[in-house]
Amino acid sequence: MSKRDTSQPKTGQPKTSKRRNGLTYAEAGVDIDAGNLMVEKIKPLVRATRRPGADGEIGGFGGLFDLKAAGFTDPVLVAANDGVGTKLKIAIDAGKHDTIGIDLVAMCVNDIVVQGAEPLFFLDYFATGKLDPDQGAAIVGGIAEGCRQAGCALIGGETAEMPGMYHGNDYDLAGFAVGAAERGQLLPTDDIVEGDVLLGLASSGLHSNGFSLVRRIVAASGLAWSDPAPFNDEATLAEALLEPTRIYVKSILKAIRNTHGIKALAHITGGGFPENIPRVLPKDFSAELDLEAIDVPPVFSWLAKTGGVAPEEMMRTFNCGVGMILAVASGQAAQVAAVLQEAGETVTPIGRIVPRRDAGVIYRGSIGL
């Protein structure tokens, strides 16, 4: 992992310079010692993400990755970057920072695996107005956990302490992931046909989209983040809403390699079904979804009823219980589903590919909100 630069504001003076009887960098709001302490705290977390191709230590100016050592012969690189959106605000307000990093990794690596690529390494950007080493270590701990779940190495990061740029305890995160696939093995394939089956993989909850609407609904409900969740007897409202985004990488890669039946994958993020599924389909085909086959988790029903959100708006904003959709050859759907279930996924047939009509997604039945 490359060395984290923990003091970002640039001045005409070296970072550690001090004029006689003058101000110091710490007095200006940037604590280099706090940054160094955070680096020490995260070193073991970073080491735990090592994998073939990445075994560097913290301290370099850049992270290294050896594609040959990772087993690739003629790879095509696939890159993705993303953030967590205003889900961060709930983590900040609730003081719960240990899982938001999982979301950051998930949003990037799930976008890589849908192209048939294996995520290889990850870098993060963490910006705050006042660095708290323990908080920072908790955040990076979540990032490291996400990397372990995805099988990718955390090889670099940036911690930016920027006084005056963020209010109070606010911070922001951005993630960058790079993966690879052998040339000729990228998805979607060019043989999608009418009758191909659509399989849905269950989400873990809201994942990381729609949280500006979520926060608006919670504010109108009068509930506090520490109150029991109305839709979950075992968690506070904050804990339930902060359930980390599911990382589908290992199960999907296993299904791709063991069945060769997956033709396309759609990560259901912002825009929901109508915006994400058509992105991976040829222009002469549509996805026909059987909405009554979808098992909608209680959190979505609560949001819809409490906020008075119409079903169409729910499906355009949230995943509604389906975090990933696969287009699979009809004759191999059972085999693909079996491999995914063995890998821990909840798999449901939710539709099929049909000739293109007016819309890229056609709904049948009603969703159970």
From Swiss-Prot:
An annotated GO cellular component of this protein is:
cytosol
InterPro entries linked to this entry: PurM-like_C_dom, PurM-like_C_sf, PurM-like_N, PurM-like_N_sf, PurM_cligase
Q: Which CDD domains match?
A: PurM (cd02196)
Which GO terms of type biological process are on file? 'de novo' IMP biosynthetic process; adenine biosynthetic process
Q: What is its EC number?
A: 6.3.3.1
Output the Gene Ontology terms for molecular function: ATP binding; phosphoribosylamine-glycine ligase activity; phosphoribosylformylglycinamidine cyclo-ligase activity
Reaction equation(s) it catalyzes: 2-formamido-N(1)-(5-O-phospho-beta-D-ribosyl)acetamidine + ATP = 5-amino-1-(5-phospho-beta-D-ribosyl)imidazole + ADP + phosphate + H(+)
Q: Which Gene3D superfamilies match?
A: PurM-like C-terminal domain, PurM-like, N-terminal domain
Q: Which domain of life is it from?
A: Bacteria
Chain segments carrying region Disordered: 1-22
Question: What keywords would UniProt list here?
Answer: ATP-binding, Cytoplasm, Ligase, Nucleotide-binding, Purine biosynthesis
Pathway info: Purine metabolism; IMP biosynthesis via de novo pathway; 5-amino-1-(5-phospho-D-ribosyl)imidazole from N(2)-formyl-N(1)-(5-phospho-D-ribosyl)glycinamide: step 2/2
* Localization terms from the record: Cytoplasm
Q: Where is it mostly found? A: cytoplasm
- Identify the enzyme class: ligase
Q: List the HAMAP family.
A: AIRS
Q: Which family does it belong to?
A: Belongs to the AIR synthase family.
Name of the featured protein: Phosphoribosylformylglycinamidine cyclo-ligase
Q: Which gene encodes it?
A: purM
